[in-house]
Regions:
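Alpha/beta-hydrolase superfamily serine-hydrolase fold, recognizing
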Residues: 53-60, 64-285
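A glycine/proline-hinged amphipathic helix-loop "lid/cap" segment
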Residues: 1-61
Length: 285
């Protein structure tokens, strides 16, 4: 991409003013993690949801559509699925002839990664027994989870999805490769991410591939499409992970938004429209 659009500049300015204060304050993120309530009640939305073994799953599009997309939402493992995810899932269903399923998974700090792995594994087993043309997709923390999950299912002899598509995935939950572009990221902060990452990992080590896919085995993973902005805190870690994927022989396409911020393909902008065209092209191959 070339010069950043005016719309994206305005969006970034707004994001800077609305950046959560706990992302840059150890005291505030610790307070958040000590007081945040669990998401036990169903999420309310105008969109339809179903129940899968006790897990709420939002659905978009025709159940008989040619393609199936499982979208694992981001939010640093503490933020619930939101309007941005709903709208993107709706767009996917309308433009890609896809039945989109978006699980509402347990969040930190009351829950940790192991619980979500169990729920998503059961859900995925049912899915691959009944549907074809499956794509696993996710943004930010959800993107990192998708990558870890696809590494994990190799160990239990479950089939890979047909493709993996992730936006700004959190690939190193321990943030082990400083320095990071903390000041320039209008959404995320290193201080907050480090503490949240510990909470999400629970009893697992921060370098356990199930929470940090950059440390996992990438051989024989499904083909991938990965997006990142070069002005986001995760850019360096994602770039390093993409190199590991290539070394391990994974068929990966890496798209970098010049001057762009975290999960930029999910925002309304010319850059996001260009990103969606790339996503759409994957469904025509």
């Amino acid at each position: 991409m070339s010069k950043k659009s005016f719309i994206s500049k305005i969006e970034e300015l707004i994001l800077n003013f609305t950046k959560p204060d706990y992302m840059d304050s150890k005291e505030k993120v610790e307070e958040l993690l000590s007081t945040k309530e669990s998401n036990e009640n169903p999420v309310k939305s105008i969109f339809k949801s179903i129940d899968s073994n006790g897990m709420q799953i939002f659905t978009f599009g025709d159940e008989n559509a040619e393609n199936t997309i499982v979208f694992i939402h981001g939010g640093a493992f503490i933020g619930e699925i939101n309007y941005q995810h709903f709208l993107y899932c709706y767009l996917l269903s309308r433009k890609l002839d896809a039945y989109v399923l978006a699980p509402v998974y347990p969040l930190a700090p009351k829950h940790s990664a192991n619980e979500t792995f169990e729920l998503i594994t059961d859900f995925y087993k049912d899915l691959i027994s009944s549907r074809n043309n499956i794509v696993l997709m996710g943004d930010s923390a959800g993107g990192g989870f998708v990558l870890s999950f696809c590494q994990y299912i190799k160990t239990i002899d479950l089939a890979q999805p047909d493709e993996i598509i992730v936006f700004s995935p959190w690939v190193d939950i321990g943030m082990s490769n400083p320095p990071y572009k903390n000041e320039s990221d209008p959404i995320l902060g290193e201080v907050g991410l480090r503490e949240i990452g510990k909470s999400w990992a629970g009893d697992w080590s921060l370098d356990d591939y199930r929470v940090s896919p950059t440390f996992g085995d990438n051989k024989n993973l499904a083909k991938m499409l990965i997006f990142a902005g070069d002005n986001e805190i995760f850019h360096k870690d994602i770039l390093s992970y993409v190199e590991k994927l290539k070394e391990d022989g994974v068929d990966v396409k890496f798209v970098v938004g010049e001057g762009m911020f975290h999960i930029y393909p999910l925002f309304p902008s010319p850059e996001a429209r260009a990103a969606f065209k790339i996503v759409k092209a994957e469904f025509k191959d």
